[in-house]
Amino acid sequence: MDFTQDHFALFGLPRRYALDNAELDRLYREVQARVHPDKFAHQPDAERRLAMQWATRINEAYQTLRQPLSRAKYLLSLSGVEVERERRMSAEFLMQQMEWREAVAEARAALAVDELEALHARLKKEMREQYLKLAAQLDAPDVGAAADLLRQLMFQEKLLAEIDDALAAAEA
């Protein structure tokens, strides 16, 4: 195994956004079994340390590829785009975000579970569509558009978590 391989190469996968999670899970277990530190328990210290480094590297790669948002960020980073550094968003999207946040705040204050659930469903639907669009942009690749859409999805994932928190608080 080669430490310079990207996450996709570690698992023998093509470098693309669309992945079969069941296949990724299978490959993870297969690769992890080859380098698991327990297999090296009776080996010299250097080999045990190397096995631990490999296990850590494989776990990190798996966690990155398993999550759609982190997989998209990683793909863009392989193209030289660091999404976290750039913060520009369209005025239209920022207005939409403000409207969403106001609606969540009002529903949270009123403990309106039905309203929060409706907001959650609408946001999830919109995000599903955006994830499909993101996949096409990443596989094209249209890294500029993909980076913009990924930044929007990062905001929306945070908002979704806020709605989940508000629902938990309202139902408690």
State each model region's role:
Residues M1-A172:
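C-terminal accessory/regulatory regions appended to core domains
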